[in-house]
């Protein structure tokens, strides 16, 4: 099993389902579901403008909310540079997305069950020397489309978009995006840059989540829509 990082927050929605923050996560899920009235959203890219914004914890908890709602859900750790989901779910990471793209493993060996019903995790796998090139390959597009046919909903946790190009490459395929912003430490120009990069790549920014927002003492997540 994965050695846990002491800084990793719990799966609030699963472990503390009646907490205020769990309700906030469910509210975010509802906003995502109703953000596109014409077409059902089946996949979601979650990124941030910088590191340490809380995107991985958000990704995990959003995935749990979909699983709890009865959706057969998969969370993909798309951050092959600094993977986190295997720590959050306490899973091995010897086999995952990176191996799958280069045909060194199978779906059954890479996709792991979790303690959450209806939720599987595709961990990042060993860090490759060329993450962006692997993501841009036709093999990844094939993998993603095959997984869409197998799951009701897919969440992809990606690296910060202003740091490396990985999230832009994912956005070309996944399309629907949510940007996580640190409410305490952010730069308006960097946030605009992040949104611009997602849009330029072909992504549709559904909205943003302000993390560390002091709404009340029990909650730190707030979802909003907006063009600016």
Curated annotation (Swiss-Prot):
GO annotation, cellular component aspect: plasma membrane
Keywords assigned: ATP-binding, Capsule biogenesis/degradation, Exopolysaccharide synthesis, Kinase, Nucleotide-binding, Transferase, Tyrosine-protein kinase
Keyword Nucleotidyltransferase in record: no
rRNA-binding as UniProt keyword: no
CDD domains found in the cross-reference section: BY-kinase
GO molecular function: ATP binding; non-membrane spanning protein tyrosine kinase activity
Pathway in which this enzyme or protein is active: Capsule biogenesis; capsule polysaccharide biosynthesis
Gene Ontology terms describing biological process: capsule polysaccharide biosynthetic process
EC number, as in UniProt: 2.7.10.2
Record's catalysed reaction(s): L-tyrosyl-[protein] + ATP = O-phospho-L-tyrosyl-[protein] + ADP + H(+)
Family: Belongs to the CpsD/CapB family.
Reported function: Required for the biosynthesis of type 1 capsular polysaccharide.
Protein name: Putative tyrosine-protein kinase CapB
Gene name per UniProt: capB
């Amino acid at each position: 099993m994965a050695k846990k990082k002491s800084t990793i927050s719990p799966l609030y929605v699963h472990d503390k389902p009646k907490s205020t923050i769990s309700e906030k996560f469910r509210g975010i899920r509802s906003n995502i579901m109703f953000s596109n009235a014409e077409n059902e959203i089946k996949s979601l890219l979650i990124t941030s403008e910088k590191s340490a914004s809380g995107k991985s914890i958000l990704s995990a908890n959003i995935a749990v909310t979909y699983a709890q709602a009865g959706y057969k859900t998969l969370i993909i750790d798309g951050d092959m540079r600094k993977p986190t989901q295997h720590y959050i779910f306490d899973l091995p990471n010897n086999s995952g997305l990176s191996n799958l793209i280069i045909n060194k493993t199978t779906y059954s060996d890479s996709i792991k069950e979790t303690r959450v019903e209806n939720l599987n995790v595709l961990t990042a796998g060993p860090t490759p020397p060329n993450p962006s090139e692997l993501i841009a390959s036709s093999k990844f597009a094939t993998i993603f489309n095959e997984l869409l046919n197998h799951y009701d909903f897919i969440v992809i946790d990606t690296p910060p978009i202003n740091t490396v190009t990985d999230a832009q490459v994912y956005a070309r395929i996944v399309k629907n995006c949510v940007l996580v912003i640190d409410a305490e430490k952010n730069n308006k120009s960097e946030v605009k840059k992040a949104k611009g990069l997602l849009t330029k790549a072909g992504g549709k920014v559904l909205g943003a989540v302000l993390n560390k927002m002091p709404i009340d003492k029990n909650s730190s997540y707030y979802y909003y829509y907006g063009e600016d």
